[in-house]
Curated annotation (Swiss-Prot):
Keywords: Cytoplasm, Hydrolase, Lipoprotein, Magnesium, Manganese, Membrane, Metal-binding, Myristate, Nucleus, Phosphoprotein, Protein phosphatase
N-myristoyl glycine lipid modification positions: G2
Protein name as it appears in the record: Protein phosphatase 1A
One GO MF term: protein serine/threonine phosphatase activity
Gene name per UniProt: PPM1A
């Protein structure tokens, strides 16, 4: 289940890059969790004749970070170096790629199992994996677990991966056929995902193949033909993001942020902060990959954003002045603002996405501010 800190760790790891007609940014934050178990991969230009291909992935570890870390360093090699992926001479076909991805997952899982056995089963960790392999003609969505990826095309969610949960009928059938059960929506009442890399305690049913175990390492792979005119961006994120934001919400929020800044790291940081303030208690990681026709910065949107920030600053000042000598706490300020009809809040993010703006004004104007106050708590905020 995971243990929690008294205060969230809000320091972020960031990266960004560009190439092959793509731009990407990423952000990850430990948040309320005692350990940071997420990992990620971002590679533009693959080796072995695949210079025009790119690969991105997010790994959400559980019961430790070992599997997530190993996969972020080695999964891509297992995918692109197996014979199913390479196929015959020339560029791999769509079926080569899909089969190679599946083979790569099974191979790395078996490799990690052997390594774990050599250590007498010392590593009990596991990890989800969600990724995209982007060729000049296709985008291959890859998913194993309950992290999620989506494609925004022509201002709408065009595709999103399906979470692998034990309560899903097909997943539940496999679990039961392997002698397991689904209780409180968990495998044997314990694990909240039905597919993952690692988790070898759930992969030891004799007489069953690797994809027939209580927990399967087999990914779902979907190939989507690229559309130069309509493809805008891809979001890959762990469930710490999706727990508090739906597909359309996050798509709308990211699109609105891209209209006010072209800094993809900043956009990802805003996603992570907003999800923290919406109540996410998990590690959070997000990768944003933009195609050439992603939304561009709009002077009108920038102006509206500045006007909104100014409006919020004035309202915070008014709320503080109205209280006279007794300065209200930040929770009271946020609740007051939440009860108002504030125009032009970012879609999907709403007031939570402006928490940093509100808090900065509050701290500047509050003469009694205690630096030890836990201003990051979201308990009972709304």
């Amino acid at each position: 289940m995971g243990a929690f800190l008294d205060k969230p760790k809000m320091e972020k790891h960031n990266a960004q890059g560009q190439g092959n007609g793509l731009r990407y940014g990423l952000s990850s934050m430990q948040g309320w969790r005692v350990e940071m178990e997420d990992a990620h991969t971002a590679v533009i230009g693959l080796p072995s004749g695949l210079e025009t291909w790119s690969f991105f992935a997010v790994y959400d570890g559980h019961a430790g970070s070992q599997v997530a870390k190993y996969c972020c360093e080695h999964l891509l090699d297992h995918i692109t170096n197996n014979q199913d992926f390479k196929g015959s001479a020339g560029a791999p076909s769509v079926e080569n790629v899909k089969n190679g991805i599946r083979t790569g997952f099974l191979e790395i899982d078996e490799h990690m199992r052997v390594m774990s056995e050599k250590k007498h089963g010392a590593d009990r960790s596991g990890s989800t994996a969600v990724g995209v392999l982007i060729s000049p003609q296709h985008t291959y969505f890859i998913n194993c677990g309950d992290s999620r990826g989506l494609l925004c095309r022509n201002r709408k969610v065009h595709f999103f991966t399906q979470d692998h949960k034990p309560s899903n009928p097909l997943e539940k059938e496999r679990i039961q056929n392997a002698g397991g059960s689904v209780m409180i929506q968990r495998v044997n009442g314990s694990l909240a995902v039905s597919r993952a890399l690692g988790d070898f305690d759930y992969k030891c049913v004799h007489g069953k193949g690797p994809t027939e175990q209580l927990v399967s390492p087999e990914p779902e792979v979907h190939d989507i033909e690229r559309s130069e005119e309509d493809d805008q961006f891809i979001i890959l994120a762990c469930d710490g993001i999706w727990d508090v934001m739906g597909n359309e919400e996050l798509c709308d929020f990211v699109r609105s942020r891209l209209e006010v800044t072209d800094d993809l790291e900043k956009v990802c940081n805003e996603v992570v902060d907003t999800c923290l303030y919406k109540g996410s208690r998990d590690n959070m990681s997000v990768i944003l990959i933009c195609f050439p026709n992603a939304p561009k910065v709009s002077p009108e949107a920038v102006k509206k954003e500045a006007e909104l920030d100014k409006y919020l600053e004035c309202r915070v000042e008014e709320i503080l002045k109205k209280q006279g000598e007794g300065v209200p706490d930040l929770v009271h300020v946020m609740r007051t603002l939440a009860s108002e009809n504030i125009p032009s809040l970012p879609p999907g993010g709403e007031l939570a996405s402006k928490r940093n703006v509100i808090e900065a004004v509050y701290n500047r104007l509050n003469p009694y501010k205690n630096d030890d106050t836990d201003s990051t708590s979201t308990d009972d905020m709304w």
